[in-house]
């Protein structure tokens, strides 16, 4: 993605990473130092490339501002990402405990944290109203996330998980981690849509 220097924030890289760690404490659950650093770096890069001054202001999607705000900062991209990370971890552990299906916890948490990271550059607007920008209109959701993951040397399985999480893709999940992230993403999103009286992804 060509970077417009006008969109680069005046804060330092470390300032942005510190803020990302504050907003997404689930990053600390990734035990592998290299993978944890890559997740932070990808979030920092898309933020730097965007017009958003504050990551916490980005709505989850265009429907989010109209959804009931029952708690502070409900239905932002950050709270959605945190919800998917937490739901994924607990779901995977339940399936492992009750059915014996193992999973890679680090890969699962990292995938959950990165599944919507490209929305930072796909959407433009304010915390009260967003729409797809140039990249979001021309490139399928998740493709830029996958590109950045390839650039940082993440596994084919993790890249697959990001591509397969969205109904925009014709690829269905082929790993347990990808399957769990897809369903927990739908669960959190449909919870918002049901509360807002809108059509569910499930339909």
Regions found by a protein language model. Name each.
Residues 1-2, 203:
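Short intrinsically disordered terminal tails
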Residues 131-137, 200-203:
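A short alpha/beta connector and helix-capping loop motif
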Residues 84-87, 138-152:
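An active-site-proximal "capping" alpha-helix that borders the catalytic cofactor pocket
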Residues 80, 115, 141, 165-166:
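Histidine-centered active-site/metal-ligand motif
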Residues 103-109, 146-150, 154-203:
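Histidine/acidic-rich helix-loop-helix segments that form or flank divalent-metal centers
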Residues 2-131:
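Acidic/His-rich, divalent-metal-binding segments that scaffold phosphate/diphosphate chemistry
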Residues 119, 136-139:
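Active-site-proximal loop/helix of nucleotide/amide-processing enzymes and allied scaffolds
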Residues 127-132, 141-145, 165:
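Short, local alpha-helical segments
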């Amino acid at each position: 993605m060509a970077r417009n220097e006008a969109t680069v924030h005046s804060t330092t890289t470390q300032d942005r990473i510190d803020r990302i760690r504050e907003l997404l404490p689930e990053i600390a659950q990734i035990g592998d130092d290299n993978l944890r650093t890559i997740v932070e770096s990808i979030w920092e890069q898309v933020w730097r490339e965007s017009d958003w001054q504050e990551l916490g202001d980005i709505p989850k999607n265009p429907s989010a501002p109209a959804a009931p705000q029952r708690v502070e900062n409900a239905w932002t991209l950050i709270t959605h990402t945190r919800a998917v990370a937490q739901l994924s971890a607990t779901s995977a552990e339940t399936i492992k405990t009750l059915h014996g299906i193992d999973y890679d916890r680090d890969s699962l948490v990292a995938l959950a944290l990165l599944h919507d990271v490209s929305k930072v550059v796909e959407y433009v607007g304010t915390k009260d109203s967003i729409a797809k920008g140039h990249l979001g209109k021309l490139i399928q959701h998740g493709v830029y996330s996958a590109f950045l993951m390839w650039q940082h040397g993440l596994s084919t399985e993790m890249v697959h998980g990001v591509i397969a999480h969205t109904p925009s893709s014709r690829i269905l999940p082929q790993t347990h981690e990808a399957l769990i992230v897809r369903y927990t993403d739908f669960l959190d999103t449909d919870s918002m849509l049901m509360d807002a009286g809108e059509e569910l992804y499930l339909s």
